[in-house]
């Protein structure tokens, strides 16, 4: 069976060699914390976008897709940067971090990318075998090179021994087997805008050894429970990735349309025509909720006061609704706990058809939407924050409260659509967990 490859491509401003090493590859730099906006010449005509995520998210996300990653990046007026990484090198606890050498090269043309990747393969393999580049290095008596080779050899012997004692295969053998021959080919880059000559800049990541969740998307014929659950979770994770409530909603006045499009496609058995799994062009649009029977749409200010529009059983209240926070809620006043203003939209329908104000056709329409897209999401600056909105997440305790008192609690993830819209500028205390999904469990998140 042919090796499945995942490729992620974009037409962003790309990275030079120095930027790739200092901003993406090296751990613990200040690139995300500097607060500097992207230079105008790098925005490709787009508006200024806030920086998203935390330092290290890119590396962790790449490693989660699969162990072997070929990275190609092109910045305007710069050469192509090409690097090859096997993330399993960093799983060896006996290996010194300083002994791991990630090969990085620059090339001037597209045609040179895959040939130079072969050289990178040989260099990367040395992190496991310890073999020198050439006979001259093999015969050298430089103590530091000899010591490094010995440390690498010893580290993998120790790691292999531990794995075998646990009944597992040798980690070194798995890496060597994958690096025997690179599975990447020119057609894997055929959809990249830079490869097609449609853009002067961008980045491409080619990943091999796909994790189970991605493999389940490639082979849609898998019908076992695990594969089906993976496909469902994948859809829940990436559908509605961009805030579709950005137009004509009162709750959107604090955030801007990110002007961001995406798509996930699968080419089966090297077919010429891909199958669209999901994408911003064919996903749920909040405009479809214009006639839903219950609506809350407005803004919470920094004092916790809600001002907005209410609809109940299909009837819009004429006056603006103002709701003050409960008496037992005290808003934080310390700078590290303050919550800024944010937008809230909720659209919902009745569970029981006999209670609805909708027609039979409308009720069935919204019921069908709910089966596929219901949930309460969180967006920052127009892009979704995970895991909020997935069926396995109840951050706002909506389902928990209903399970305790179904007669009193109306809201339920299965029959509501909605989102909280925040911005990094107005809510800097709502911070992402490093390397994990969701907000840090601090005072601001609890409010």
Regions found by a protein language model. Give the residues of each.
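Beta-sheet entry/capping signal
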Residues: 5, 59, 68-70, 202-204, ...
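Short secondary-structure boundary/capping segments
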Residues: 24, 85-88, 220-224, 280-282, ...
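Charged regulatory segments coupled to nucleotide-binding catalytic modules in large multidomain enzymes
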Residues: 214-216, 229-230, 297-447
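Extended, regular secondary-structure scaffolds
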Residues: 205-347, 352
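Short alpha-helical segments and helix-capping/turn motifs at coil-helix boundaries
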Residues: 54-57, 187-192, 247, 360-364, ...
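Solvent-exposed loop and beta-edge segments used for protein-protein assembly and interaction
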Residues: 63-65, 197-201, 256-258, 338, ...
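GHKL (Bergerat-fold) ATPase N-terminal catalytic module, capturing the glycine-rich phosphate-binding loop
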Residues: 1-209, 215-217
């Amino acid at each position: 069976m042919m090796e499945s490859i995942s490729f992620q491509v974009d037409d962003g401003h790309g990275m030079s060699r120095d930027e790739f090493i200092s901003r993406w590859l090296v751990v613990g730099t200040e690139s995300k914390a500097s607060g500097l906006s992207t230079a105008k010449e790098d925005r490709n005509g787009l508006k200024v976008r806030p920086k998203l995520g935390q330092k290290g998210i890119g590396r962790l996300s790449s490693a989660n897709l699969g162990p072997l990653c070929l990275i190609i990046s092109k910045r305007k007026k710069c050469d192509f940067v090409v690097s090859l990484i096997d993330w399993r090198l960093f799983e060896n606890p006996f290996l010194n971090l300083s002994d791991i050498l990630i090969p990085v090269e620059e090339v001037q043309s597209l045609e040179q990318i895959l040939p130079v990747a072969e050289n990178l393969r040989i260099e990367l393999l040395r992190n496991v075998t310890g073999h020198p580049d050439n006979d001259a290095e093999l015969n050298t008596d430089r103590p530091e090179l000899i010591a490094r080779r010995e440390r690498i050899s010893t580290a993998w012997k120790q790691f292999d021994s531990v794995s075998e004692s646990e009944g597992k295969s040798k980690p070194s053998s798995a890496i060597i087997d994958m690096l025997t021959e690179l599975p990447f080919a020119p057609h894997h880059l055929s959809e990249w805008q830079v490869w097609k000559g449609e853009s002067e800049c961008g980045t491409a990541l080619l990943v091999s050894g796909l994790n189970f969740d991605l493999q389940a998307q490639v082979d849609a014929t898998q019908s076992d429970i695990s594969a089906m659950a993976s496909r469902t979770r994948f859809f829940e994770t990436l559908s509605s990735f961009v805030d579709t409530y950005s137009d004509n909603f009162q709750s959107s006045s604090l955030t801007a349309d990110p002007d961001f499009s995406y798509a996930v496609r699968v080419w089966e058995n090297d077919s010429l025509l891909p199958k669209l799994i999901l994408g911003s062009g064919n996903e749920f649009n909040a405009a479809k909720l214009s006639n839903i029977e219950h609506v809350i749409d407005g803004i919470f200010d920094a004092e916790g006061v809600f001002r907005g529009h209410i609809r109940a059983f299909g009837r819009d209240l004429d006056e603006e609704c103002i709701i003050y926070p409960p008496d037992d809620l005290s808003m934080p006043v310390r700078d590290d706990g303050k919550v800024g203003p944010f937008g809230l939209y909720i659209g919902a329908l009745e569970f029981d058809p006999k209670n609805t104000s909708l027609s039979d056709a409308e009720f069935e329409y919204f019921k069908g939407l709910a089966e596929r897209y219901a949930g309460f999401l969180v967006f920052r600056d127009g892009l979704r924050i995970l895991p909020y909105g997935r069926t396995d997440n109840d951050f706002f305790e909506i389902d928990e409260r209903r399970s305790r008192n179904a007669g009193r609690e109306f809201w339920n993830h299965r029959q509501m659509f909605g989102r909280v819209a925040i911005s990094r500028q107005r809510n800097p205390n709502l911070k992402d967990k490093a390397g994990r999904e969701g907000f840090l469990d601090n005072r601001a998140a609890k409010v």
